[in-house]
Amino acid sequence: MSQLLVRPHEPDATGCVLEVTPQSAGWAHVGFKVCRLAPRQELTGGEADRETCIVVLNGSAHISINDVALGLVGGRSSVFDDVAPGAVYVPAGARFLVVAETGLEVALCSAPGRPGRPARIIAPEAMSREVRGQRTNTRYVRNILPQTEAADSLLVVEVLTPGGHWSSYPPHKHDNAVLGQETRLEETYYHRLNPSQGFAFQRVYTDDGDLDETLCVKDGDVVLVPRGYHPVGAPHGYDLYYLNVMAGPERKWIFRNDPAHEWMLLKR
């Protein structure tokens, strides 16, 4: 199996079904973990030198930071609902406790950080929704933790791509630091499909061809994007959801399109 593809496993004692660490991915910044909890099951975490964005993918949970209760977070029944997820920002140096109110799927998105920022619930109205692309390139984006919102390293966004459409397209990359033109960001894609027996395709490739892999993605898979362009295609009949986590030396999302395919942006 490709080293860029991480598949889920049965829940362990903590409910974890999938985990990506900087060590397992072979990079320096992004961490990602998915847990599925039964009602009243607890999940704890927090790191001295890493910030975390808790994203309640579906279900609801009571969340506390350093023993301070933030309240009930979440509530949507599926990632395919067109509503914002529940989300909480946890600064580096803080501890969190998640107690499932219902059956729960939660993502823990992490990256390097410094202690001192306040913990907070990310309000649904703060998560801007936008429509990108047109015709069979149309997809629906919700910015959970964009660069306009306070954090040290993390960028978090979710995207719904209708069946038969493309996403992260035309192909773009963000693997080189060029002032004002491109930033260097690692990225994970957490994929869900509806219906769940479906599949999607994601290609990860570089200009020089040193990296060029096309991956068949199933429900619950993660694709690692250490570098290169990374377009996604959803077959007819299967809607695709993905949660992106990005982080790098600079907290800005500035990308460069593949010049071979940039022409289509000029053709309206």
Model-predicted regions and their roles:
Residues G31-V99:
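Extended, compositionally biased flexible segments
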Residues P11-T44, E51, N137-T188:
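A short glycine-rich, His/Asp/Glu-containing loop-to-beta-strand
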Residues F32-R36, C53, A87-Y89, L108, ...:
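Conserved hydrophobic/aromatic beta-strand scaffold that supports enzyme active sites
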Residues L104-N143, Y205, L243-R268:
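Double-stranded beta-helix
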Residues D81-E101, A111, C216-G237:
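Conserved metal-binding segment of the jelly-roll/cupin
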